[in-house]
Amino acid sequence: MAKLHDKYQETVSPELAKKFGFTSVMQVPRIEKITLNMGVGEAVADKKVMEHALRDMTAIAGQKPVVTVARKSVAGFKIRDGYPIGCKVTLRGERMWEFLERLVDIAIPRIRDFRGMSAKSFDGRGNYAMGVREQIIFPEIEYDKIDKIRGMDIVITTSAKNDEEGRALLEAFNFPFKK
């Protein structure tokens, strides 16, 4: 079991229930899933780029990503309907907790010029979205073996009803928000 999951059950859940006055354990916000998305527009010109992106995403997430394809043709971007343009992974359960632990403890502190996560990135329903500019902040990625530095989107989906509950949940896991 991941340390953060144990921490959630033992300390975070009771604290949030007390803070927001929840009567049932099921009312307490919890993290439902973490979605990682990497847009690889260059894959249209070079098919090898997608292979490298899939390899990086597999190393970071610990599970095989799904290739996302273009839904419609856009002449300006030289893409056709059905072209592979990215990859994504949805983490749940044990892998989700392990990834969150690595993200908070290892990856976020390795971001260059880091001054805290923006609290404005909540969507109004307690879910948090963030962007990472370089995949090399994750320890699984070897700097010598990457072909190009590329970023990704990370969305943390919670069962919180509003942003206040979502922020309290993530702060309980030592998420470094700007003050």
Curated annotation (Swiss-Prot):
GO biological process, one term: translation
Keywords: Ribonucleoprotein, Ribosomal protein, RNA-binding, rRNA-binding, tRNA-binding
Gene3D superfamilies for the chain: 3.30.1440.10
Endoplasmic reticulum as UniProt keyword: no
Gene Ontology CC annotation, any one: ribonucleoprotein complex
Pfam (any one): Ribosomal_L5
GO molecular function: rRNA binding; structural constituent of ribosome; tRNA binding
Record's function text: This is one of the proteins that bind and probably mediate the attachment of the 5S RNA into the large ribosomal subunit, where it forms part of the central protuberance. In the 70S ribosome it contacts protein S13 of the 30S subunit (bridge B1b), connecting the 2 subunits; this bridge is implicated in subunit movement. Contacts the P site tRNA; the 5S rRNA and some of its associated proteins might help stabilize positioning of ribosome-bound tRNAs.
Record family assignment: Belongs to the universal ribosomal protein uL5 family.
Description of how the protein assembles with itself and partners: Part of the 50S ribosomal subunit; part of the 5S rRNA/L5/L18/L25 subcomplex. Contacts the 5S rRNA and the P site tRNA. Forms a bridge to the 30S subunit in the 70S ribosome.
This protein's name: Large ribosomal subunit protein uL5
Species this protein is from: Shewanella sediminis (strain HAW-EB3)
Taxonomy of the source species: Bacteria, Pseudomonadati, Pseudomonadota, Gammaproteobacteria, Alteromonadales
Chain's gene name: rplE
